[in-house]
UniProtKB/Swiss-Prot annotation:
Pfam families: Band_7, Flot. InterPro entries: Band_7, Band_7/SPFH_dom_sf, Flotillin_C, Flotillin_fam. Heterooligomeric complex of flotillins 1 and 2. This is Flotillin-2. Gene3D superfamilies: Band 7 domain (3.30.479.30). It comes from the Eukaryota. GO terms for biological process: cell adhesion; protein localization to plasma membrane; regulation of myoblast differentiation. PANTHER family: FLOTILLIN-1-RELATED, FLOTILLIN-RELATED. Signal peptide: none annotated. The gene is flot2. A lipid is attached at residues 4, 19-20 (S-palmitoyl cysteine). GO terms for cellular component: endocytic vesicle; endosome; flotillin complex. It comes from Carassius auratus (Goldfish). The lineage of its organism: Eukaryota, Metazoa, Chordata, Craniata, Vertebrata.
C-alpha cells in the first residue's frame, strides 16, 4: 500500500525509489504524488527566496586600497525540471541555512575577485555596474547548482583609512564646484532659454499681430471691395434713374417745346398781322406825310445850296479881283522900291563913307530898340555907386563900346568915321 502526498507552490516534492529496483524520480511542484510504503522515499526542498548578505572585509582593489564591501542577494532554487534535479542532487536533505551558506560563499568569492580588478572610484561611483559584473560572473556557477540569482545589489562600501571620506570630500568639492558651475550654467541656460522663450513669444506675438493685421487688412480690403461694389451698383442704379429721369425730362421738354413752337407760331402769326396793320397805319400816318415833308425839305435844301453856291462864286470873284489889284499894287511898290534902292546904291557909291555913315545912323535907332527890348519890361533900374560922377563915366564907357558892338553886328568900323572920331575926341 502507499499514500498520496501533496505539496504547495513554495516547495518541491521529490519521490524516489520503486519496485523492481527502478531509479525513476518524480519532481512535483504545487501538486500531489503517490508514494509506496517501504519502497518509496519522499523528500522536500524549499523554493522560497533566500536573502544573502555577502561581505568582503579589507579586500584590496586594483590600486591596493583595502576596502570593505557588503551586499544583498536574492536567490532561489530554479523550478525547471533539469535544474531542479541538479539542485536536488546538490542540496536535497540540507537545511535552508546550509544552502544559503554554500551560495553565500560562492558570491563572496566572486565579489572578492571582482574587487581586485576595479578601482575604488569605479566601485564607489558606479555601484550598479559593479553589481551587474558580480551577477554576471556568479550566475553561471550558482546556476550549475540549480540556484538562480534574482537580484544582487551593493549595500555599503567603506574603508578603515578614511580613503573614501577623503575621496568624498574631494568629490564633494568637485561636485560643489560642478554644482556651482552647473547652477551658473543653468542660470545662463535659463536666461538664454528665457530670452529665447521671450523671443519666441515675441515672434509668435509679432506673427500673430502680423496675421491679425493681415486678416484685418484682408477684411478692410474685402469691405472696401464690397463697398466699392455696392457704391458701383448704387451709382449705376442712380445713373440709370437719372438717365431715365433725364429721358423723361427730355420728352417733357420736347413736348413743351412743341407747345411753345405752336404758341410761338400763333404769336408770330398774330405779330405778323399786327406788323402788317402797323405798317399800313405808319404808311398812312407817317410815311406819306414824311415823304411829303422830305420832298419839301429836299426842295428847300436845293434852293439853299444853289444860293450858297452863287454867293460863294461871287465871293470868289471878289477875292480874285482884290488879289489881282493887290498884286498890281505890290508889283508897282516893288518896282518903286527897287528903283529907290538902285538910286540909293548909286548915291552911296557916289558919296562913299558919308553914305555908309548915313545908313548906320539910320539903323542905329532900330539896333538900340532891339537891344533895349529886354529892358522895356524892367520897371526900375538902380545903380549903386558912392560917387555921383560914376554915372556919367558909365555912360561914356557904354558909348565908347558902341562902335565895337556895331562893328561886330554890321562889319562897319565907326571908329574910322571922321564925325565919330570928332565926337569921341571931344568927349575925351
Amino acid at each position: 500500500m502507499g499514500c498520496c502526498l501533496t505539496v504547495g507552490p513554495n516547495e518541491a516534492l521529490v519521490v524516489s525509489g520503486a519496485c523492481c529496483g527502478s531509479d525513476a524520480k518524480t519532481y512535483v511542484v504545487g501538486g500531489w504524488a503517490w508514494a509506496w510504503w517501504l519502497i518509496s522515499d519522499t523528500q522536500r526542498i524549499t523554493l522560497e527566496i533566500m536573502t544573502l548578505q555577502p561581505k568582503c572585509e579589507d579586500v584590496e582593489t586594483a590600486e591596493g586600497v583595502a576596502i570593505t564591501v557588503t551586499g544583498v542577494a536574492q536567490v532561489k532554487v530554479m523550478t525547471d525540471q533539469d535544474l531542479l534535479a541538479v539542485a536536488c542532487e546538490q542540496f536535497l536533505g540540507k537545511s535552508v541555512m546550509e544552502i544559503k551558506a554554500v551560495v553565500l560563499q560562492t558570491l563572496e568569492g566572486h565579489l572578492r575577485s571582482i574587487l581586485g580588478t576595479l578601482t575604488v572610484e569605479q566601485i564607489y561611483q558606479d555601484r550598479d555596474e559593479f553589481a551587474r559584473l558580480v551577477r554576471e560572473v556568479a550566475a553561471p556557477d550558482v546556476g550549475r547548482m540549480g540556484i538562480e540569482i534574482l537580484s544582487f545589489t551593493i549595500k555599503d562600501v567603506y574603508d578603515k583609512l578614511d580613503y573614501l571620506s577623503s575621496l568624498g570630500k574631494t568629490q564633494t568639492a568637485a561636485v560643489q564646484r560642478d554644482a556651482d558651475i552647473g547652477v551658473a550654467e543653468a542660470e545662463r541656460d535659463a536666461g538664454i532659454r528665457e530670452a529665447e522663450c521671450k523671443k519666441e513669444m515675441m515672434d509668435v506675438k509679432f506673427l500673430a499681430d502680423t496675421r491679425m493685421a493681415d486678416s484685418k487688412r484682408e477684411l478692410e480690403l474685402q469691405k472696401a471691395a464690397f463697398n466699392q461694389e455696392v457704391n458701383t451698383k448704387k451709382a449705376e442704379s442712380q445713373l440709370a434713374y437719372e438717365l431715365e429721369a433725364a429721358k423723361e425730362q427730355q420728352k417733357i421738354r420736347l413736348e413743351e417745346i412743341e407747345i411753345e413752337v405752336v404758341q410761338r407760331k400763333k404769336q408770330i402769326s398774330i405779330e405778323e398781322k399786327e406788323i402788317e396793320r402797323t405798317e399800313k397805319e405808319l404808311i398812312a400816318t407817317v410815311k406819306r406825310p414824311a415823304e411829303a415833308e422830305a420832298y419839301k425839305m429836299q426842295q428847300l435844301a436845293e434852293g439853299q445850296k444853289l444860293k450858297k453856291v452863287l454867293i460863294a462864286q461871287a465871293e470868289s470873284e471878289k477875292i480874285r479881283k482884290i488879289g489881282e489889284a493887290e498884286a498890281i499894287s505890290i508889283s508897282s511898290v516893288g518896282k518903286a522900291e527897287a528903283e529907290s534902292m538902285r538910286l540909293k546904291a548909286e548915291a552911296y557909291q557916289q558919296y562913299g563913307e558919308a553914305a555908309k555913315t548915313a545908313l548906320v545912323l539910320e539903323a542905329l535907332p532900330k539896333i538900340a530898340g532891339k537891344v533895349a527890348a529886354p529892358l522895356a519890361r524892367t520897371n526900375e533900374i538902380v545903380i549903386l555907386s558912392g560917387d555921383g560922377s560914376r554915372v556919367s563915366g558909365e555912360v561914356n564907357r557904354l558909348l565908347a563900346e558902341l562902335p565895337v558892338s556895331i562893328n561886330a553886328l554890321t562889319g562897319v568900323d565907326l571908329s574910322k568915321m571922321p564925325l565919330l572920331q570928332k565926337m569921341t575926341g571931344a568927349q575925351a
